[in-house]
């Protein structure tokens, strides 16, 4: 079995085509590159993204559960990737680049939070077990919304990062809700002290008035296939400076999309089974397997499943206001159909608490999460 997996993975890497030589601009998480003159910088950027794949031989989930997530954990791994990118932006900045000769500092703290251990904040163990509260048994396949909801709940325990996570439902981003969320608890210290992951965090004065924001927007862009009217808007999401990318893929096959070139989406593929990594006694982590060191995968944008979640990271209130302006300009430009709208206050037709309540601590949150998660079983809408 292991030999077969190794052969399969080796062939997958060997068959990955090189990046195209094209004059069209390449966009990766808010950065623009030329494939003709900046190919090395482009590939270095992509390689620097944390790449989470299937793993085997990790601690049994829940003590008696699975020791591998092969076949069921791809969306969980994609959720880890988009959230890891948020933490990279939060702690080391979007322009940070991986140096495999000198992996250290806050980067290792980030990676530690995703290791396959029960006490890592965003481990496969934590996501799978928190998912039980979302109505998903351990080993069941997730859709984009479920993994977003689970990550939001896990982030509460990550005091080192001290981030606010907002999931915008019903294709609507309500600015007032986000302002309240990011200002909540601003008088509390963000010093986490000694954390369960084995590292310490220091308070960040920049968080005193506004918590850095991770904004996740679950969307449905069609029935069994994406509506072509959304394609240009989807591409634009990778051009916004605050972009975290998109989690989605094909039915029952999730990918983490990080950019595009022409009509092709660029993505990291979690469907490779690797051995679980354990840090050594001196806290050294063998981290090369967490970075994709072959040319990235690509697929035509029309092939993406319509059920996705789009992510953005806003480091400050000014950054969030800048994001709002980007999105509003896009909606006014005409042509492409907006995937979601940004409004200052909750529209009246959504304000009835018996219909919808999107406040973070709403008692109806679990009911709403499941209501909006009907794509999870097959990762595409089967009926309306």
Swiss-Prot record:
Disulfide bonds: none annotated. A motif (LIR) lies at residues 379-382. It is found in: Cytoplasm; Cytoplasm, Cytosol; Cytoplasmic vesicle, Autophagosome; Endoplasmic reticulum. It catalyses: [protein]-C-terminal L-amino acid-glycyl-phosphatidylethanolamide + H2O = [protein]-C-terminal L-amino acid-glycine + a 1,2-diacyl-sn-glycero-3-phosphoethanolamine; [protein]-C-terminal L-amino acid-glycyl-phosphatidylserine + H2O = [protein]-C-terminal L-amino acid-glycine + a 1,2-diacyl-sn-glycero-3-phospho-L-serine. SUPFAM superfamilies: Cysteine proteinases (SSF54001). The keyword Cytoplasm applies. Keywords: Autophagy, Cytoplasm, Cytoplasmic vesicle, Endoplasmic reticulum, Hydrolase, Mitochondrion, Protease, Protein transport, Thiol protease, Transport, Ubl conjugation pathway. Its EC number is 3.4.22.-. The active site is at residues 74, 269, 271. The keyword Cell cycle does not apply. Its main location: cytoplasm. It comes from the Eukaryota. One of its GO terms (biological process) is protein processing. One of its GO terms (molecular function) is cysteine-type endopeptidase activity. One of its GO terms (cellular component) is autophagosome. Belongs to the peptidase C54 family. Cysteine protease that plays a key role in autophagy by mediating both proteolytic activation and delipidation of ATG8 family proteins. Required for canonical autophagy (macroautophagy), non-canonical autophagy as well as for mitophagy. The protease activity is required for proteolytic activation of ATG8 family proteins: cleaves the C-terminal amino acid of ATG8 proteins to reveal a C-terminal glycine. Exposure of the glycine at the C-terminus is essential for ATG8 proteins conjugation to phosphatidylethanolamine (PE) and insertion to membranes, which is necessary for autophagy. The LIR motif (LC3-interacting region) is required for the interaction with ATG8 family proteins. Required for proteolytic activation and delipidation of ATG8 proteins. This is Cysteine protease ATG4B.
